[in-house]
Swiss-Prot record:
Gene3D superfamilies (alphabetical): 1.20.1250.10
Lineage: Eukaryota, Metazoa, Chordata, Craniata, Vertebrata
InterPro entries: 4_helix_cytokine-like_core (IPR009079), IL-5 (IPR000186)
Chain positions carrying an annotated carbohydrate: 76, 90
Family: Belongs to the IL-5 family.
One Gene Ontology term of the molecular function aspect: growth factor activity
Signal peptide as annotated in the record: 1-21
Name of the protein: Interleukin-5
Source organism (scientific name): Sus scrofa
Gene name tied to this protein: IL5
């Protein structure tokens, strides 16, 4: 029994370390992408005539699909080349990561108390992390 407890704790520790590693990797990828976006902004703007649907909403979590549609439009209208290729590769990796995370939204059926606990946390996030628009 003691060995089982040790193995369980070891497994939890490994999962935690793995989650931290993925989070750190994603943080570095986003930071690199922001740098590339700054560096290549003028090239991406081009002649400035490209019109891309841009969300008005400031709660970016709600507009993920629209943001990535805009990225696809920008990618299709930008001259290919090594200069921006890494930027678009990074954006694709970020989208893949978000898509994988969205798969965690579908869950199992739990008792109402667990759902209410989740709902309470969800509303707390909306209350503290989202900008409320009028």
């Amino acid at each position: 029994m003691r060995m089982l407890l040790h193995l369980s704790l070891l497994g939890l520790g490994a999962a935690y370390v793995s989650a931290i590693a993925v989070e750190n990797t994603m943080n570095r990828l986003v930071a690199e992408t922001l740098t590339l976006l700054s560096i290549h902004r003028t090239l991406l703007i081009g002649d400035g005539n490209l019109m891309i649907s841009t969300p008005v909403h400031t709660n970016h979590q709600l507009c993920i699909e629209e943001v990535f549609q805009g990225i696809d439009t920008l990618k299709n209208q930008t001259a290919r080349g090594d200069a921006v290729e890494k930027l678009f590769q990074n954006l694709s990796l970020i989208k893949e990561y978000i898509d994988r995370q969205k798969k965690n939204c579908g869950g199992e059926r739990w008792r109402v108390t667990q759902f209410l606990d989740y709902l309470q946390v969800f509303l707390g996030v909306i209350n503290t992390e989202w900008t409320m628009e009028s």
